[in-house]
Protein backbone atom coordinates (compact mmCIF):
# COMPACT_ATOMS: atom_id res chain seq x y z
CA UNK A 1 0.00 0.00 0.00
CA UNK A 2 1.32 3.43 -0.93
CA UNK A 3 2.65 5.61 1.86
CA UNK A 4 0.76 8.67 0.58
CA UNK A 5 -2.83 8.94 -0.53
CA UNK A 6 -3.00 8.66 -4.30
CA UNK A 7 -4.20 11.86 -5.93
CA UNK A 8 -6.49 10.64 -8.68
CA UNK A 9 -8.71 13.67 -9.33
CA UNK A 10 -8.26 17.40 -9.55
CA UNK A 11 -10.66 17.87 -6.65
CA UNK A 12 -7.87 16.59 -4.38
CA UNK A 13 -5.62 19.58 -5.12
CA UNK A 14 -6.06 23.30 -4.55
CA UNK A 15 -8.05 25.15 -7.22
CA UNK A 16 -4.92 27.02 -8.33
CA UNK A 17 -3.24 23.66 -9.07
CA UNK A 18 -6.12 22.10 -10.98
CA UNK A 19 -4.79 23.25 -14.39
CA UNK A 20 -1.67 21.17 -13.66
CA UNK A 21 -3.85 18.11 -13.14
CA UNK A 22 -5.76 18.87 -16.34
CA UNK A 23 -2.49 19.12 -18.30
CA UNK A 24 -1.22 15.81 -16.89
CA UNK A 25 -4.48 14.05 -17.75
CA UNK A 26 -4.47 15.59 -21.23
CA UNK A 27 -0.96 14.29 -21.95
CA UNK A 28 -1.27 10.87 -20.31
CA UNK A 29 -4.97 10.06 -20.49
CA UNK A 30 -5.37 9.60 -16.72
CA UNK A 31 -3.81 10.24 -13.34
CA UNK A 32 -1.87 7.12 -12.49
CA UNK A 33 1.43 5.79 -11.24
CA UNK A 34 4.08 8.17 -9.95
CA UNK A 35 2.01 11.24 -10.79
CA UNK A 36 -0.54 10.25 -8.14
CA UNK A 37 2.33 10.80 -5.70
CA UNK A 38 4.04 13.76 -7.41
CA UNK A 39 0.79 15.73 -7.19
CA UNK A 40 1.37 16.15 -3.47
CA UNK A 41 3.73 18.82 -4.84
CA UNK A 42 1.76 20.05 -7.86
CA UNK A 43 4.44 22.40 -9.18
CA UNK A 44 6.96 19.56 -9.30
CA UNK A 45 4.36 17.27 -10.89
CA UNK A 46 3.71 19.80 -13.63
CA UNK A 47 7.37 20.30 -14.41
CA UNK A 48 8.03 16.56 -14.43
CA UNK A 49 5.05 15.95 -16.68
CA UNK A 50 6.50 18.43 -19.14
CA UNK A 51 9.90 16.70 -19.04
CA UNK A 52 8.25 13.30 -19.25
CA UNK A 53 6.25 14.33 -22.31
CA UNK A 54 9.51 15.08 -24.10
CA UNK A 55 11.30 11.96 -22.87
CA UNK A 56 8.39 9.62 -23.59
CA UNK A 57 6.62 11.09 -26.60
CA UNK A 58 8.44 13.95 -28.30
CA UNK A 59 12.13 13.11 -28.46
CA UNK A 60 13.74 11.61 -31.52
CA UNK A 61 15.21 8.61 -29.73
CA UNK A 62 13.64 5.32 -30.85
CA UNK A 63 10.87 4.25 -28.46
CA UNK A 64 12.41 0.80 -28.08
CA UNK A 65 15.65 2.39 -26.83
CA UNK A 66 13.73 4.53 -24.33
CA UNK A 67 11.83 1.50 -23.04
CA UNK A 68 15.00 -0.59 -22.70
CA UNK A 69 16.60 2.20 -20.68
CA UNK A 70 13.49 2.66 -18.52
CA UNK A 71 13.14 -1.07 -17.92
CA UNK A 72 16.80 -1.28 -16.91
CA UNK A 73 16.42 1.68 -14.54
CA UNK A 74 13.43 -0.07 -12.97
CA UNK A 75 15.44 -3.26 -12.44
CA UNK A 76 18.53 -1.45 -11.13
CA UNK A 77 16.49 0.58 -8.65
CA UNK A 78 13.99 -2.22 -7.85
CA UNK A 79 11.08 0.00 -8.87
CA UNK A 80 8.12 -2.37 -8.99
CA UNK A 81 5.63 0.06 -10.55
CA UNK A 82 8.03 1.29 -13.24
CA UNK A 83 9.02 -2.27 -14.12
CA UNK A 84 5.41 -3.32 -14.63
CA UNK A 85 4.68 -0.33 -16.84
CA UNK A 86 7.81 -0.74 -18.95
CA UNK A 87 7.73 -4.49 -19.54
CA UNK A 88 4.24 -4.24 -20.99
CA UNK A 89 5.42 -1.52 -23.37
CA UNK A 90 8.58 -3.50 -24.21
CA UNK A 91 6.50 -6.47 -25.31
CA UNK A 92 4.29 -4.25 -27.48
CA UNK A 93 7.45 -2.94 -29.16
CA UNK A 94 8.75 -6.45 -29.86
CA UNK A 95 11.52 -6.61 -27.27
CA UNK A 96 12.35 -10.33 -27.03
CA UNK A 97 11.41 -12.20 -23.86
CA UNK A 98 15.08 -13.19 -23.56
CA UNK A 99 16.01 -9.52 -23.25
CA UNK A 100 13.28 -8.81 -20.69
CA UNK A 101 14.38 -11.86 -18.68
CA UNK A 102 18.05 -10.84 -18.88
CA UNK A 103 17.27 -7.38 -17.53
CA UNK A 104 15.01 -8.83 -14.82
CA UNK A 105 17.66 -11.39 -13.80
CA UNK A 106 20.61 -8.97 -14.09
CA UNK A 107 22.60 -10.61 -16.87
CA UNK A 108 23.16 -10.09 -20.59
CA UNK A 109 22.98 -13.62 -21.97
CA UNK A 110 20.91 -13.85 -25.13
CA UNK A 111 20.46 -10.09 -25.49
CA UNK A 112 20.92 -8.74 -29.04
CA UNK A 113 23.99 -6.48 -29.30
CA UNK A 114 22.01 -3.29 -29.96
CA UNK A 115 19.80 -3.92 -26.93
CA UNK A 116 22.78 -4.94 -24.79
CA UNK A 117 24.47 -1.62 -25.56
CA UNK A 118 21.54 0.27 -24.01
CA UNK A 119 21.16 -2.09 -21.05
CA UNK A 120 24.88 -2.02 -20.21
CA UNK A 121 25.13 1.77 -20.59
CA UNK A 122 22.18 2.21 -18.23
CA UNK A 123 23.52 -0.30 -15.70
CA UNK A 124 26.99 1.21 -15.74
CA UNK A 125 25.76 4.78 -15.36
CA UNK A 126 23.56 3.83 -12.40
CA UNK A 127 26.11 1.56 -10.72
CA UNK A 128 29.38 3.41 -11.33
CA UNK A 129 28.10 6.91 -12.08
CA UNK A 130 30.71 7.20 -14.85
CA UNK A 131 31.04 5.88 -18.39
CA UNK A 132 34.16 4.81 -20.30
CA UNK A 133 35.19 6.95 -23.28
CA UNK A 134 34.77 4.03 -25.68
CA UNK A 135 31.17 3.52 -24.61
CA UNK A 136 30.37 7.18 -25.10
CA UNK A 137 32.04 7.15 -28.51
CA UNK A 138 30.00 4.13 -29.60
CA UNK A 139 26.73 5.65 -28.39
CA UNK A 140 27.49 8.97 -30.08
CA UNK A 141 28.26 7.12 -33.31
CA UNK A 142 24.93 5.29 -33.09
CA UNK A 143 22.68 8.15 -31.91
CA UNK A 144 24.59 11.40 -32.44
CA UNK A 145 25.21 13.89 -29.65
CA UNK A 146 21.53 14.79 -29.38
CA UNK A 147 20.48 11.16 -29.07
CA UNK A 148 23.21 10.42 -26.56
CA UNK A 149 21.96 13.25 -24.36
CA UNK A 150 18.33 12.18 -24.83
CA UNK A 151 19.25 8.67 -23.70
CA UNK A 152 21.15 9.96 -20.68
CA UNK A 153 18.25 12.29 -19.84
CA UNK A 154 15.76 9.43 -20.12
CA UNK A 155 17.81 7.42 -17.64
CA UNK A 156 17.72 10.40 -15.25
CA UNK A 157 13.99 10.89 -15.71
CA UNK A 158 13.15 7.25 -15.08
CA UNK A 159 15.51 7.21 -12.09
CA UNK A 160 13.49 10.04 -10.55
CA UNK A 161 10.26 8.14 -11.16
CA UNK A 162 11.79 4.98 -9.68
CA UNK A 163 13.02 6.74 -6.56
CA UNK A 164 9.63 8.33 -6.00
CA UNK A 165 7.65 5.11 -6.42
CA UNK A 166 10.11 3.38 -4.09
CA UNK A 167 9.96 6.10 -1.42
CA UNK A 168 6.17 6.04 -1.60
CA UNK A 169 5.95 2.21 -1.85
CA UNK A 170 3.82 2.41 -4.98
CA UNK A 171 2.94 -1.11 -6.09
CA UNK A 172 2.67 -2.42 -9.63
CA UNK A 173 -0.54 -1.57 -11.44
CA UNK A 174 -3.16 -4.34 -11.48
CA UNK A 175 -2.29 -6.89 -14.15
CA UNK A 176 1.27 -5.62 -14.63
CA UNK A 177 4.28 -7.89 -14.38
CA UNK A 178 5.57 -7.89 -10.81
CA UNK A 179 9.27 -7.39 -10.17
CA UNK A 180 10.92 -9.14 -7.25
CA UNK A 181 13.30 -6.57 -5.75
CA UNK A 182 16.91 -7.70 -5.60
CA UNK A 183 16.44 -10.76 -7.83
CA UNK A 184 19.52 -11.75 -9.81
CA UNK A 185 20.60 -14.62 -12.01
Regions found by a protein language model. Give the residues of each.
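Hydrophobic alpha-helical segments
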Residues: 1-185
Amino acid sequence: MARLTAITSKQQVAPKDQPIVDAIVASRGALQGPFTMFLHCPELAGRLAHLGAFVRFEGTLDMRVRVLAAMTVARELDAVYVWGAQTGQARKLGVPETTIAAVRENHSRGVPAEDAQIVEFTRTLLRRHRIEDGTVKALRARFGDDGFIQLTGAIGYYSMLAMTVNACELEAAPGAEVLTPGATA
